[in-house]
Design a protein with these regions (language model features):
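Conserved AMP-binding/adenylation subdomain of ANL enzymes
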Residues: 20-37, 45-84, 99-100
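Gly/Ser/Thr-rich phosphate-binding loop
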Residues: 58, 83-88, 97-170, 174-183
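Short beta-strand->loop structural element characteristic of the AMP-binding/adenylate-forming
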Residues: 10-13, 40, 62-68, 136
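Conserved AMP-binding A3 loop
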Residues: 1-21
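Alpha-helix capping/helix-boundary segments
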Residues: 70, 91-93, 120
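Conserved pre-ATP/AMP-binding loop-to-beta segment of ANL
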Residues: 1, 8, 31-37, 178
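AMP-binding (ANL) adenylation modules
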Residues: 42-46, 140
Length: 184
C-alpha cells in the first residue's frame, strides 16, 4: 500500500521483475557509474524509493540516510560524504535554492539530482544549476515503480543560456528505456 502522499493510501501490486527492470532503467537513464554515493531525501517506503535501493546496490553504491530533510542536513551530508546522486521533489530543491549562503558554501559542483513528484518550475531547475547541481527531470507514478519518463538533455542545450536550459529541462520527457518490458 502506498503512503497516500497525494491522496488516500491505495494498494498497488508490484512484482520483482518490474522492480528489477526499473532499477536497471534508473542506471541507464541517469547514466549512473559504479560506486555512487546516494543521499536519501525521499522515503524508501514511498513507491519503494523509486527503486533506488536496488539501483544503488546494482552499482555497488553507498546509501547516506538523513534523520531530517532540511537544507542544513542535506548540504552537510553532501559535503561530508561526497554525495554524487540524490532524488527529491521540487519542494526539497526549493529548500536548497533558498537556503542561507553559509550552508551552500563548499558544496562541490556536479552533484546529480533527479527532480520529480510534481512538475518542477524552471526557476528551481535554474537555481539548482546556479548552485552547481546537475538536475534531470523525471515523471512517474506509484503504479509504475516510480520514474517512468525522463527529460533527456540534448548536447546542444549546453550552448543555450541557463534560463532556456532550465525551461527545456522542465518539460515532460520520453519513456524510460525499459518501461515496455514492465508492461504485462
Amino acid at each position: 500500500y502506498t503512503s497516500g502522499t497525494t491522496g488516500n493510501p491505495k494498494g498497488v501490486v508490484y512484482h520483482h521483475r518490474g522492480a528489477a527492470i526499473n532499477a536497471v532503467s534508473n542506471v541507464l537513464d541517469w547514466d549512473i557509474n559504479k560506486h555512487p554515493v546516494y543521499l536519501w531525501t525521499l522515503p524508501m517506503f514511498h513507491c519503494n524509493g523509486w527503486c533506488f535501493p536496488w539501483t544503488i546496490a546494482a552499482r555497488a553504491g553507498v546509501n547516506v540516510c538523513l534523520r531530517r530533510v532540511d537544507a542544513q542536513h542535506i548540504f552537510a551530508a553532501i559535503k561530508e560524504h561526497g554525495v554524487t546522486h540524490y532524488c527529491a521533489a521540487p519542494i526539497v530543491h526549493n529548500l536548497l535554492v533558498n537556503a542561507p549562503d553559509e550552508l551552500k558554501a563548499g558544496v562541490p559542483a556536479g552533484v546529480k539530482g533527479l527532480i520529480a513528484g510534481a512538475a518542477p518550475p524552471a526557476s528551481i531547475i535554474e537555481g539548482m544549476e546556479k548552485l552547481g547541481f546537475d538536475l534531470t527531470h523525471v515523471y512517474g507514478l506509484t503504479e509504475v515503480y516510480g520514474p517512468a519518463s525522463v527529460c533527456v538533455k540534448q548536447d546542444e542545450w549546453n550552448d543555450l543560456n541557463i534560463g532556456e536550459r532550465a525551461r527545456l529541462n522542465a518539460r515532460q520527457g520520453v519513456r524510460y528505456h525499459m518501461q515496455q518490458a514492465i508492461a504485462v
